[in-house]
């Protein structure tokens, strides 16, 4: 964290923010990729785990919890199965991180010019976070859809797409442009409040958490306060909007390939409200929160790594530019 508890909007040039955001996204994605695959598999599973008769006729795998799912994937698909969809996901996280942090910084700077009628700091952070998340999600959504489809497909002869370029060609040919944006409304509807809540909470906790390493009875690495603030903010925000995340995943695998993924019994859904209503009627409220545990397990370290890496990368970029200026 920056000295003096600066807000994110006050730090770095536009180029530095883009680079730091991209680096943070790249590293964060690689670290949490296995948990992302597990989350997607659990979210696409429609049968009840508490009722064995509901999956008596299921031909695909039955996943029961995070550790069980990891073991099943390792046994049936090998270690690489836990990194399925990582290429589009890495592209997604790099682009998303750069766009998100740039939009956040730009929006907060624009809002700061409203003096003497400035909004309260938490509201500024919420608006900036919501805009950053919404714009980044819409701009990178095709990569998000590809990430989900690759994570949901089987191995060997059961693969739906052979490569990233093959998936782009096949979706464009069989589903058209609209195929790349299935579930986009649910994604934006989820990410806007999520990122608004995340950044508002993060900015509020950041100055408080900055003193945590100094007060700790054991030595903590630099940036621990940033990581802790990211964890708390992520868990609180993720829980509130999780049903829309699940709806997004169900919609992303619709289309002509719907019955070809690991879960071959995915129902046909039409629209956000239709999907949410059908899940609630057939699986209850619990069905809308399927995969929440692994999602929180994933979101906490992902946000911690993202914010820690972003702060460290931005600091290094700023120091490098200052040093380069002195040498000129």
Curated annotation (Swiss-Prot):
Q: Which GO terms describe its molecular function?
A: thiamine transmembrane transporter activity
The record, for InterPro entries, names: Mit_carrier, Mitochondrial_sb/sol_carrier, Mt_carrier_dom_sf
Subcellular locations according to the entry: Mitochondrion inner membrane
Entry membrane topology: Multi-pass membrane protein
Keywords for the protein's UniProt record, in alphabetical order:
Membrane, Mitochondrion, Mitochondrion inner membrane, Repeat, Transmembrane, Transmembrane helix, Transport
Disulphide connectivity of cysteines = none
Q: Name one Pfam family in it.
A: Mito_carr
| Keyword Transport attributed | yes
Q: Which SUPFAM superfamilies match?
A: Mitochondrial carrier
Write out the similarity annotation: Belongs to the mitochondrial carrier (TC 2.A.29) family.
Identification of the protein by name: Mitochondrial thiamine pyrophosphate carrier 1
Q: Which gene encodes it?
A: tpc1
């Amino acid at each position: 964290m920056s000295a003096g508890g600066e807000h994110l909007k006050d730090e770095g040039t536009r180029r530095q923010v883009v680079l730091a955001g991209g680096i943070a996204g790249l590293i964060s994605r690689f670290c949490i990729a296995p948990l992302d695959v597990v989350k997607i598999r659990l979210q696409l599973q429609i049968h009840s785990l508490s009722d064995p008769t509901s999956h008596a006729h299921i031909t695909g795998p039955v996943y029961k919890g995070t550790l069980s799912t990891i073991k099943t994937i390792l046994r049936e698909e090998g270690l690489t199965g836990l990194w399925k969809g990582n290429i589009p996901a890495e592209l997604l996280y790099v682009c998303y991180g750069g766009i998100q942090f740039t939009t956040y910084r730009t929006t907060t700077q624009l809002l700061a010019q409203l003096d003497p009628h400035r909004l309260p700091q938490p509201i500024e952070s919420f608006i900036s976070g919501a805009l950053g998340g919404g714009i980044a999600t819409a701009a990178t959504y095709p990569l998000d859809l590809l990430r989900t489809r690759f994570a949901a497909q089987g191995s060997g002869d059961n693969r739906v797409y052979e490569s990233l370029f093959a998936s782009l060609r096949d979706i464009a040919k069989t589903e058209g442009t609209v195929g790349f944006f299935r579930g986009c409304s649910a994604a934006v509807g989820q990410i806007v409040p999520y990122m608004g809540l995340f950044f508002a909470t993060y900015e509020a906790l950041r100055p408080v958490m900055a003193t945590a390493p100094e007060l700790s009875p054991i030595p903590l690495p630099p940036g621990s306060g940033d990581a802790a603030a990211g964890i708390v903010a992520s868990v609180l925000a993720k829980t509130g909007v999780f049903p829309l995340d699940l709806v997004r995943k169900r919609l992303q695998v619709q289309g002509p390939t719907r019955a070809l993924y690991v879960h071959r019994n995915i129902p046909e859904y039409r629209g956000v409200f239709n999907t949410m209503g059908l899940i609630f009627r057939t699986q209850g409220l619990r069905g809308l929160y399927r995969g929440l545990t692994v999602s929180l397990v994933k979101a906490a370290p992902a946000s911690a790594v993202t914010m820690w890496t972003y702060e460290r990368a931005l600091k290094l970029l700023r120091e490098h530019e200052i040093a380069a200026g002195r040498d000129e």
